[in-house]
Every structure is written in C-alpha cells, then in structure tokens.
Amino acid sequence: ALLNICLSRLSTNPLILFLFFGITSVLINAFCFKKYVKYFMISMLFYLVHTYVARELMQIRAGLACALCLFSLRYIVNKCPWRFLITIILASSFHLGAVVFLIAYPLGQYKFNSKKVAIAIICALIISSIFPLGAFFKSLPSYAFLNRIQYYNDTEYGQSSGLFTNVVIIKELLIIIVCLAYRRVLENIPYFNVSFNTYVVSLIWLILWNDFSIVASRIATFYSIGEVLLMAMLPFITKSGGSRNILAVLLILLAGVIMFMNIYTGKWDGVVII
C-alpha cells in the first residue's frame, strides 16, 4: 500500500514501523470505544485479551486499517458518505483489504429483521455444504490477478478451518443469537445496528469460505471489528442496577478465560504488555 512505502522511506528500522502501527491502532481503537459505548472498559478488555494479540501483533497493517474502519462507523451512523469514503481510502492505503468495508455503509442504513438474518445464515450453511467456494476457487486456472491468493492453496492458510469445529464461527454465532434474542432492547443503542449488521456479514463470510481459511479470515477480520462493541452492549439486556453489574462482572471473567486460553494455545508466547 502507498502509505506503507512512504513510511518505509522514513526509516528502515522495522521496530519504528511496528511501534507506529501498534500505538496508532491502539489509540484509535480506544478513542472509538470511548465514543461508541457506555461500558468502555469492557470493550477495551476484550480488545486487549484477544484482538490486540491476534491482530495488532500479527497483522500490524490490517490492525491499523481495521482501526480506521472502526473509526468510520461514526460516518455511517451520522450519514456522512464522503467522510466515510475518505476514511476507507486512507485505511486502504495501509491494507488493500479495507476496500471491502465500503459495503458497510449501505449495510448500516438498514435494519434487517431477525427472520432475514436467520435465513441468510442458514443459506450460507447450505451453500458451504453443497458448493464449497474454497474448493471451487482452488480449481480455477492460474490467472495473474489471482496469483497472490492462489499462492496459499498448498499452504496451511489454504486449509479448511471447519464449520462447527471452528471456534470463531461458534463464538460469532452465539453472540448473534444473543443479540437477536434481545434485539428490541439493544437496537436503541446508537452503534448497535451497524455493528450487528457488519458482524453478521463476518459470520456469513466465514461460513461460506470455511474451506479456504486465508480468504475467510482476511475479509471477516474487517467485518468483525464491531465484536468488542457488541460485547460492551450486552449489559443493557438486563435491568439497570445489580443485575447489570453482575452481567458486566461475568463478561470481565469471560475476558479472563479468553486471555488464559490464548496463553495456553501459545498466542501470547513472548508477549509482554507494559
């Protein structure tokens, strides 16, 4: 991407570039959490115990691009298409994959009912079972514009991530089911609709491309940016007072479980948070 080339001209030290991408991503995310949700610390906690490790430390360019996509949600909610477009162009200058987030603008303007969401997910499951898109893609002849993706065919990134054996798909499906069950309460929260709609797209994409993990994860990463926002909105499904505080504590404990799972699986090996 263009800005990556410009930054590399300023310094050849990879540590400086890493610090720039990492610090900028964290600051943008923290700013957005503070503006978008009431339970800021819940979003921040889930971000640090998982997203920060799985994305910012492993895909630093995608991490910054995702942070800018998260920032662009305000322009979807406030219906500022040109500002949204400029923000996505900026994100694309760091990681070209951010271009796919352009579809988020029209998605954010609609309120899909629970029935349509359920039908879309069921259709995705059926399609992935009878017509695996990854297998079809891998069978295509070698074209120049496909070379970059087809390179992963014979690597671990081209393998199937599974459907109901895929922890990410199960997690996203459970979050969506909870959101649908309490939608009447949650839909009154300003950023719920756009976060939920894009999150549904993330799940559908993961299901459709489950047999080609690199394609599934690269695109779903951008559409799952609202996950930490949705987690911070869940306390509102209970009545204010003790019940809401108890649910907030349970979410904090869940974040702790996720952190220990990441440590156990080795994702945190050598990671030191200062």
PLM features per residue range, with description:
Residues C69-W82:
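Membrane-interface transmembrane helices that cradle and orient dolichyl/undecaprenyl
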Residues A1-T12:
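Short hydrophobic/aromatic helix or loop-helix immediately within or flanking a transmembrane segment
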Residues L10-T24:
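Loop-to-helix entry region of an early transmembrane alpha helix in multi-pass inner-membrane enzymes
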Residues Y52, R83-L107:
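Membrane-interface alpha helices of multi-pass inner-membrane proteins
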Residues A30-V49:
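Transmembrane-helix signature of polytopic, membrane-embedded enzymes
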Residues Y105, Q109-I219, N262-I273:
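Alpha-helical transmembrane segments and terminal signal-anchor/GPI-anchor hydrophobic tails
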Residues I122, K239-F260:
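Signature aromatic-anchored transmembrane alpha helix within multi-pass, membrane-resident enzymes
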Residues L57-G63:
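Short acidic/glycine- and proline-prone juxtamembrane loop motifs at membrane-interface regions
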